[in-house]
A protein has these predicted regions:
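Non-transmembrane, aqueous-exposed alpha-helical and coiled segments at domain scale
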Residues: 1-428
């Protein structure tokens, strides 16, 4: 297994952290290839649950390299908060590596993120306000500052001067916010540069050398397919390519090295922030409230309630196509226990036209009406099941239905939040 990609198949929060935590110990290296501190994932370290945002989940496994690739953006404040937390739990983070080509999140990026979101009013996107969009905007505008730039004091100051000449007038005149000086930012960031220096590598070179040596790499996706800047529900998306294709550009590893693509999907559906969601249910009553409360559907990064709805096979079909999924991991199957019947969306009706996958035209998706089938639920607590055969017949049929509708085999089934509460069918 030279290289595999793990990717979210819905709108994020599918349980990628748990599945990465589960399988990453079988790899020599885990590499994050996109996103920044907006992507919360929960891992278990020495018996303690930790919420990580910046550092790859593989960090909890001794002997596994954890690489932050060139497609990521790095907030040193968040990163070293996580390093300190992990070290307090007895993990030395010696396996952490950071691409010198990854871009820096700077204080003005966060200010601009929050101000721009506020200016959108009722059309807000639902950003985490962690500076992600403005940082990627600078990257694409070729005015961004990379981690390697911070290692040279004079170069860092020179680039900051140029950046602030552009950003300060926007902060002051457009949004009425305080401006920054070069010295202000250097006072905070240059000490981080020295802490970061031992971890910085030429990540593409490192990753390809590992593959040449016969080592295995897991590319850990952040966010999800439906939040991808190109393939998601634009403009209600993140600012990076978080689908499987981003693993190539965000790491510098060629596509021929990737053997398997594991898509993570909840047994139902959730979404944080604005944007279309055809199978959405009310959180105030009925099944929507049931899923919110039993599934503890609150964002790791923001603490916001997640919007909840029925499983949408059209979204999974779309994710399978866009990512080239070879396998699926279905999480939170246990949450559905207690429902008499379960609805599954198999198609959309858009003004009398039927779609069996996500329409690429945004307006069509906004007006999509889900077409459901109903299947029997189950009352049993399945959190103790450790093999597929132990599941109730209705739960097994539900998994088989997902396979039939998506055309992708379900290799992993999660029946609880703990690493052990997992059924491994075909992932070897």
């Amino acid at each position: 297994m030279p290289a595999s990609v793990l990717v979210g198949s819905q709108w994020g929060d599918e349980g990628k952290g748990k599945i990465t935590d589960l399988i990453s110990g079988d790899f020599d290296c885990v590499c994050r290839y996109a996103g920044g501190a907006n992507a919360g994932h929960t891992v278990v370290a020495n018996g303690h649950q930790l919420a990580l945002h910046q550092i790859p989940s593989g960090i909890v496994h001794e002997g596994v390299l954890s690489v932050i690739g060139n497609g990521c953006i790095v907030d040193p404040t968040v990163m070293f908060e996580e390093v300190d937390t992990l070290q307090a739990q007895g993990l030395d983070c010696a396996g952490l590596r950071i691409s010198g080509n990854a871009h820096l999140v700077l204080p003005y990026h966060k200010d601009l993120d929050g101000a721009h979101e506020a200016a959108l009013g009722k059309n807000l996107i639902g950003t985490t306000k962690r500076g992600i969009g403005p940082t990627y905007m600078d990257k694409m505008n070729r005015t961004g500052i990379r981690i390697q730039d911070m290692l040279d004091d004079d170069l860092f100051r020179e680039k900051l001067e140029a950046a602030l000449a552009y950003q300060n007038p926007i902060l002051e005149k457009v949004y009425g916010l305080p401006t920054y000086t070069v010295d202000q930012i250097c006072e905070t960031y240059l000490p981080y540069a020295e802490r970061m220096r031992p971890y910085i590598v030429e990540s593409s070179k490192l990753l390809n050398e590992l593959l040449d040596e016969g080592k295995s790499i897991l590319f850990e996706g952040a966010q999800a397919t439906m939040l991808d800047i190109d393939h998601g529900t634009y403009p209600f998306v993140t600012s990076s390519n978080c689908s499987a294709g981003g693993a190539v550009t965000g790491s510098g590893v060629g596509p021929c090295n990737i053997e398997r693509v594991l898509g993570i999907a909840k047994a139902y559906l959730t979404r944080v922030g604005s944007g279309p969601f055809p199978t959405e249910l009310s959180l105030d009553e009925g099944v929507g409230k049931f899923l919110l409360e039993k599934g503890h559907e609150y964002g790791v990064t923001t603490g916001r309630k997640r919007r909840c709805g029925w499983y949408d096979a059209c979204v999974t079909r779309y994710a399978a196509r866009v990512n080239g999924l070879t396998d699926l991991a279905i999480t939170k199957l246990d949450v559905l226990g207690g429902l008499d019947t379960i609805k599954v969306c198999t198609a959309y009706d858009v003004d009398g036209v039927e779609y069996d996958t996500v329409p690429e035209h945004r307006v069509s998706f906004d007006h999509a009406t889900p077409k459901y089938i109903e299947v029997p639920g189950w009352q049993e607590d399945i959190s103790g099941c450790r093999s597929f055969d132990e599941l109730p017949a209705a739960a097994k049929d539900y998994i088989k239905l997902i396979e039939d509708l998506s055309g992708v085999r379900v290799s992993i089934v999660a029946v609880g939040p703990d690493r052990e509460q997992t059924i491994n069918r075909f992932w070897k």
